Amino acid sequence: MSGIQVLLVAGTHGNEINAPWLFEQWKQKDSLINTHNINIQTVIGNPVALEQGKRYVDRDLNRSFRKDLLLSSDLNAAEHFRALELVSEYGPNGNNPCQIAIDFHSTTSSMGSSLVVYGRRPADLAIVSLIQNHLGLPIYLHEGDNAQSGFLVESWPCGFVVEVGPVPQGLLHFQIINQTLLTLDSCLKEISNVINSKTVYPEQLIVHRHLKNIDFPRDSSGVPSSLVHKDIQGRDWYPIKNGHPLFESLSGDLTLLLEGGLEEEFVPVFINEAAYAEKNIAMSLTKKEMWDVQKDWINDLSKLLNP
Amino acid sequence: MSGIQVLLVAGTHGNEINAPWLFEQWKQKDSLINTHNINIQTVIGNPVALEQGKRYVDRDLNRSFRKDLLLSSDLNAAEHFRALELVSEYGPNGNNPCQIAIDFHSTTSSMGSSLVVYGRRPADLAIVSLIQNHLGLPIYLHEGDNAQSGFLVESWPCGFVVEVGPVPQGLLHFQIINQTLLTLDSCLKEISNVINSKTVYPEQLIVHRHLKNIDFPRDSSGVPSSLVHKDIQGRDWYPIKNGHPLFESLSGDLTLLLEGGLEEEFVPVFINEAAYAEKNIAMSLTKKEMWDVQKDWINDLSKLLNP
């Protein structure tokens, strides 16, 4: 075995209970998941919130890893302490150092099995290109969104989120578990291939690049005055064009997409994710792009995993 | 207008946010809902829990209306006080008395639009027979379940629950809102017909009579060891027979329905409702029955609404 360790995180949000359940089953039965001969650390991100069945205690753990906050002496939220704890235990310079972090989430949106990367770190892009090449799943590239920062995986040299949905919060679902299991297996297999220099990279990576968040239309007291339109509800990853209905009020007032030219396509993701309403996000708009897989991505990942 | 008042309750569970949103829209625009010339009182069942986005504060409000508890001097849960408050304000002998209570819920189960009645109170059976005759929706008759008691509507002389799903908790959904709106309209229309002696009762009422709750298979520490089988997930109201798979473990172990003869049909409801896991209910089993509409049902409802 190489000295590389992979950190697998579940329950970063305490009401996303499928991955934590899967990890628990795995603990009881080693053979459930093929580790592809990789050293693994598994951890529950927010065990207190999981116990209480809620997303978080004081604040969203997956927005609590901002470096300036972690270095501050003025922490008070439970999730800031938990973030520090996770980094000092499993961070690249921690007691039990891991080089890659994979954070398993679920969503009420119809995201299927998908990956999320933050920014354009070369090693992230390299590893997700391998997983996409294997499973064909879509990748949401989250960047340039100052209101949303401090994601867990950003505290590791390489890392990404697995999002599986749709599933309500607090509900175990056989299909969601199986999708999570399949994606986890592919992640470990591809990491193992990199460690063993058996990779075949694709020529291109398909990303859905974050453009902007779209909020519900709201009345003067902040309550949504329109709801996600039925022609877009559940249609994550389906391209839409200028003029497509986004929201509809009970009186039939439509809010349309007013973006781009007549033929330009945009791809909405995280449509009506329950947890994002408090963040004023009814959906996010992305642009589908094909990127050539770059040598420096491959080199960065290779250097990290074959030091 | 007659002196009859109908109490419409939303947000009895604080994370079922669709009906509360609909009531809020209604407040802003009177014409949204046709009251069919009935006196209406609307109220948010559990406003504190709604504000906090959770099902309840201390205990399930919709299990907090047990008469012995409400008469006890030893109350301590927030929901017991709220139950007392609702009854003393809107109860049949309250400051602002209502004769019928309709309690609007949503569920993560695929219940469609459906009604729930508790026990076999004649006036309840009469009114739901009229609504079923109008909309064709299924009715779950909950009875003989000692572990589940103290439902809100039982504190009124007549009352029932409207359940609409599937929808995750904490998520506004256009279709769920529209289903709620349509059912609400039918409820008010039929009550108005009774008040105005314009009813045409059907000959029969179709009920799905509660037989038993079925829990997840659990390991020694109480964690579910199997999940709802994919052939039954989302299949509320579809009949199943002896031998039908109910649960499946990750190792492929099946738990089958072992009930009744080879040809006997049972109908599962509230399959994988997120909030029921803590109540050890993975689904409830019912029996579909056709009951003749009885004269005493009609008389009881008529006496209540035309005193």
Curated annotation (Swiss-Prot), chains A, B:
Cofactor: Zn(2+)
InterPro entries: AspA/AstE_fam, Aspartoacylase, AstE_AspA_cat, Aste_AspA_hybrid_dom
GO terms under cellular component: cytosol
UniProt entry tagged with the keyword RNA-binding: no
Binding site for substrate: 55, 62-63, 163, 276
Protein family (similarity comment): Belongs to the AspA/AstE family. Aspartoacylase subfamily.
NCBIfam families in UniProt: PRK02259.1
UniProt-recorded name of the protein: Probable aspartoacylase
Protein source organism: Prochlorococcus marinus (strain SARG / CCMP1375 / SS120)
